[in-house]
Amino acid sequence: MKKNYNNIFIVDTKAYFDAMVLYYDVQNDLVLTYDFALKKYVEDLGGNVQYLDHLVDIDKMQENNYLIYKFFTDWHYDKDGNDIFTFKDVPFGFSFRLDFWNDFVFYTRIFLSLKCISRYSFQDIYILSDEKLIFQILDTFDIKYKIFYDKSSVIDNTGYYFPIAKWLDSKIRPIGFRGFLYKTREKVSFIYGKIMPFVDKLFKPNSKYTVFIQDYHPTKRIIQHFRNDNNFTVLLEHFSRFSNKKDNLKERLLPIGGDIKNYEQIKNELLKKFESNRFHRLILSDGSDITDAIYDIIKNRISSGLSKKLLTLDSCIKYLDKNKVDLVILIANMGHTVTLFDLVCKYKKIPSYLIINGMLLNNYQDEAHYATYINSYSNSIKENYFRDIKNVYALGDPRMDTYSLIEKNKINREMPTITIGASGFNSTDLNSYVAVEFDFLYDILKAFSVLKQKGEKFKLIIKVRPNGYEKQYQSFINEYFNDLKIETISTIPMIEVLKKTDFYISIYSQTLFEASCLGIPVVYYKKDTEITNKPFDNNSELVTILNTDDMIQAFYDFKANNQRYELFLNSKVMEQYIGFLDGNNLMRNIDFIYKILRKESLK
């Protein structure tokens, strides 16, 4: 990439670029964008273009990953190591992570990328963007720029990249009808949680154990098991998903409620304390000090939700002051109510057991480290991600038991069904970028477009991730690959998609193991630039492909039943990375939970 340009254009999408294209010199200008469509358009013109959020060397970004996550761990402690955010003696600064995590990493990523511009030679920077952060950071560097304001010709500004802010707002800051549904659920849970302890005293014999369980995929069958055991009371945040009403009535819920106005004064006192007592600094590998900017992000995000945090925390404290809980079962160190409840339990010396939610592969993070006992699935994850710490046990993923019971697929190599498990932006890794899923998809579909032209026959399915936008994919296919007949699927369970699959291609995903368990040859197409542990390090038994030409050859090898796929179809090989595949993971975890409760030896 050259360093000398006439002008630099920073543009969100191709639609915006079309509004300013008359000012663009293909030979001498540089375009920076988030959008796959614009990057491809400029490349096809022969111009200079890069992803705005992907300008920095991979190793340099990885070095900064470690630095930002050290700060992420420490930011809420004062100079003496005390949590600034403490209420009724319960420290709860840890609970804010999800509130600002994406903003924090995104700012750092864009800061490091835009700093590269200061090393370029250019006359002017022209910007047409809705991202205020770009202007803020350029001002920090004292880099002058010119703004395009005329968007009148732009009808649809949707690009081919993941709208992370939109998605996060819909999930953790819901508004509108979705927000109404969330509030309704909270009210129902509060009323039920308040009433049932009194009903139980009249009609239900005391159970021996009360276990709070975070409801998600790894714990689904654990909830079902203990719900049917009269020795247990299963305590949840809300009614378990996808259960019938009869089973829901066996569950007990945390009564979280009260008047949020009662916590405004405490909120203001804590924010003042935060301003005066914050201590830790974030200095990046190049010496840049972004502490103040990051603290502004944190304060902006936590201020609006702090009263609700306090209300929830107080509800948890009041509940545990009156009720017995013997164990907390988690799937992550995230979630508003779950994390706060766990923090109160920690304060009260109540143990916790965490079953990781999917494979943990990035060693710079500390997610899922905070529990009394941890199930890492496999020895590989225990040794690499958890550094072989003593409270981690390789007990397998209960979800994988399903695959031991299913008959393996009969692979059709004449007219195969090829499923592509869509890629996705990793908002927590500096080395990820928002257009990666479309970079990934273009490469693979380009390979199959070439194969079709050569007379190969196949069916194509794209399995969109749960956080993906299916309409984006359909538009992408129509624009670039209308020669291919492709089915897009978003809501059908993965196992049902895999049952009709002969060849599976995906990113670093547990679904590659799920496919292999069904006898399906798999490919890890590494378009991502993240540094991950085995088997996704391009140095394992997993067939790993880096470019379109090799993808074409991988398909021919699949057709020829080449032995390169055999190793990763071997359950003993897979078990190194994913844990036991013997169908006994559920009972292995349940037995471990019984041992914790009975205070038996865990060896």
Predicted region positions:
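Catalytic-core helical/loop segments in enzymes performing group transfer/polymerization on anionic/lipid-linked
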Residues: 1-603
